[in-house]
A protein has these predicted regions:
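Serine-esterase "nucleophile elbow" of acetyl-processing enzymes
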Residues: 1-66, 71, 76-85
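Alpha-helical cap/lid subdomain in secreted, periplasmic
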Residues: 45-52, 56, 69-240
């Protein structure tokens, strides 16, 4: 689900780039961004889909770091992101900000996100803020789930006020969590981190949002994630 009016032309974000003028694309965040052992990562899906659809017009750099919260992203921005001079930056953060010992208020989280956005604007990067996927509530804890929801609303507000792109997947994940709990659980391997299937599903959702297609020869690889995507969107169509 996409809510900021600027998002309606998000598929054009890659139009300025070619094999002779490549885009540097950075994913910035915590462990839900960081590459893990599970296999195909959601950011890999974007890289591969871009190559299928546009050719090698890009280089993708993963700057995820396990355990980070929004304060940490601000701290390491000048070291880990600014030198890369990204043309496009995807930010996914907020889970660790909900930890009780972090003592992060909603106002501080929103302020941190605004600062990150302005830092990226200063280096002339296009910005795609992403909301989270839904955790396993019983494992994550009611208070953290509620706080995560509040923080994601702050991300929506910052995207609107600062004019960034917003990729708002959380409402779709909430449908899976509430109506299809077994499916939802198959996408998460602990309380919050994505399984291999979860990464492929998130990647599929992302490339569809960006109006990119899957390679025909790889349809079988995407089949399980595609069935979940079809289930989800047939459900949302019925509810309208």
């Amino acid at each position: 689900m996409i809510k900021d009016k600027k998002i309606f032309d998000i598929s054009k974000i890659f139009d300025a780039y070619s094999e002779n003028n490549k885009a540097t694309i950075v994913a910035f965040g915590s462990s839900v961004v960081e590459r893990t052992i599970e296999g195909m990562h959601w950011f890999d899906c974007l890289e591969i889909a871009l190559n299928w659809n546009r050719g090698r017009i890009h280089q993708c750099i993963n700057s995820g770091h396990s355990g980070d919260n929004s304060r940490d992203l601000l701290t390491r921005f000048d070291r880990d992101v600014a030198p890369l001079k990204p043309n496009i930056t995807f930010i996914k953060i907020g889970g660790n900000d909900t930890k009780p010992d972090i003592n992060m208020s909603r106002s501080e989280f929103k302020s941190n996100m605004k600062k990150l956005v302005r830092k990226l604007k200063d280096i002339e990067s296009e910005i795609c803020q992403m909301t989270y996927h839904s955790p396993i509530s019983k494992l994550y804890g009611k208070q953290r789930v509620e706080k995560l929801s509040e923080f994601m609303e702050s991300i929506r507000e910052v995207a609107s006020s600062e004019g960034t792109y917003l990729i708002d997947d959380l409402p779709n994940w909430e449908i899976l969590r509430e109506k299809y709990p077994k499916v939802h659980k198959s996408l998460i391997h602990d309380e919050i981190h994505l399984s291999k299937l979860g990464n492929i599903f998130l990647g599929l959702s992302l490339i569809k949002t960006l109006n990119l297609n899957m390679g025909e020869r790889d349809q079988a690889y995407w089949s399980k994630a595609m069935r979940i995507h079809t289930l989800l969107h047939s459900d949302t169509t019925k509810s309208k």
